[in-house]
Design a protein with these regions (language model features):
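Short beta-strand element of the alpha/beta-hydrolase
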Residues: 3-10
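Alpha/beta-hydrolase
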Residues: 134-188
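Conserved acidic catalytic loop of the alpha/beta-hydrolase fold
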Residues: 61-78
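Active-site glycine-rich loops that stabilize anionic/oxyanionic intermediates
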Residues: 10-14, 84
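Gly/Ala-rich beta-loop-alpha elbow adjacent to hydrolase catalytic centers
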Residues: 81-86, 90
């Protein structure tokens, strides 16, 4: 029997964004799931209209613990696939022994790996802005096109935005600067 595969989304998305991958892997004989982070489950449009008041307090460690709990309920360790900060979650979970294997796609950097590229800083500062407190951050279609879907046409990017984008906690990326996002590269 093929191992279970868990797909882990990145910021501003939820598990629905992995649906085409889940369908493709299921057709190949894998059991799959794409659970959402805390406060991310549901219809993206509704989540943009009705933001959970606790979203702003969500941290990288809390999301990691959420997935550890889900994985502990499985009969065996899964294969993990994650994108962006979901890829960093995969590395952390593999590091901590919660996966048989992991694939990180365009991973966010772990603690201690920092880029000072002007593009990186421009794309990421709004998400970690220390002056914004713990208020959730809302992606605009313009910003989404610049920071996430810049290889798509603007109309195609806007379609992706409408289908998948949700509000986010600034504390998830902020907290990756601390020990919760430290990776022992010898272990992964």
């Amino acid at each position: 029997m093929a191992p279970h595969v868990i797909f882990i989304h990145g910021m501003y998305l939820n598990g629905q964004s992995w649906q085409p991958w889940v369908e493709r892997f299921a057709a190949a004989g894998f059991s799959c799931s794409a659970p959402s982070w805390p406060f991310h489950n549901g219809d993206p449009h509704k989540l943009r209209l009705e933001v959970n008041p606790d979203l702003g307090d969500l941290t990288f460690a809390a999301v990691t613990d959420h997935f550890k709990t889900l994985i502990d309920d499985l009969p065996e360790r899964p294969i993990l696939v994650g994108h962006s900060i979901g890829g960093l979650l995969v590395q952390r979970l593999v590091n901590d022994g919660f996966a048989r294997a992991g694939v990180s796609i365009s991973s966010a950097p772990p603690q201690g790996v920092v880029s000072f590229s002007p593009h990186f800083l421009r794309a990421n500062f709004p998400h970690i802005n220390p002056l914004a407190g713990n208020k959730p951050v809302y992606m605009t279609p313009e910003r989404f096109h610049y920071a996430f879907c810049n290889t798509l046409t603007r109309p195609a990017s806007d379609e992706v935005f409408e289908r998948f984008v949700v509000p986010e906690s600034r504390n998830v990326p902020r907290s990756t600067f601390g020990g919760s996002a430290r990776i022992d590269f010898a272990a992964v």
